[in-house]
Design a protein with these regions (language model features):
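An exposed, glycine/acidic-rich loop-and-rim segment of catalytic or binding clefts
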Residues: 1-180
Length: 180
């Protein structure tokens, strides 16, 4: 059985009606990301983040390099890519930190998985409404989806997502919130 479970929770640490998340400050513990094809599926290549808009190893605003003329950003209409997390063999470790300077809320993400997909609501079009009736517009939330690499079954050099009969699967991801 091929198994690659994740979650798709949206966050806006500045609050529901605060607009987009481009001023959120993001840090990712990843030296590589997975480039995608025109269908936004990883090609099998691992590309270094150094010197690219995908370098979040040091904290920076999500929107800082978003409008860079990078082919990968154009394919995903923004960030919709998987990062190859450092220290995968070490189990649960801190993989990310996000801060809203507006609210001073900090979110830390911990996981034992090898990848995290950053999606910044590139295709939210205002048709979804919140419980309070607010329309979710483009980039009004971000997702950090811990997972194995997308397209793993078709990519030999990616970690296997095959679960054999009798095997059990365990994974842990946690989100820690605090006020800075």
């Amino acid at each position: 059985t091929v198994l690659n479970l994740t979650q798709h929770s949206y966050f806006n640490l500045s609050g529901e009606s605060s607009g987009d998340i481009l001023d959120h400050i993001l840090e990712l513990n990843a030296d590589y990301y997975l480039p995608v094809n025109k269908k936004i599926i990883p090609t099998g290549e691992k590309r270094a983040v150094a010197g690219t808009p995908f370098d979040f190893r040091n904290r920076k605003k999500i929107g800082r390099d978003l409008y860079n003329e990078d082919d990968q950003l154009l394919l995903g209409n923004g960030y919709d890519h998987c990062w190859v997390l450092n220290d995968y063999s070490n189990g649960v470790r801190k993989i990310s930190e996000v801060i809203s300077e507006e609210s001073m809320i900090k979110m830390e993400v911990f996981s034992d998985l090898p990848g995290v997909q950053l999606y910044i609501g590139n295709f939210l079009d205002g048709s979804l409404k919140s419980k309070k009736g607010m329309n979710y517009i483009k980039r009004s939330g971000f997702c950090l989806e811990t997972q194995f690499f997308p397209n793993s079954p078709n990519t030999e050099n990616f970690p296997s997502t095959v679960l054999e009969p009798g095997e059990e699967f365990y994974s842990k991801t946690s989100f820690k919130f605090s006020v800075k």
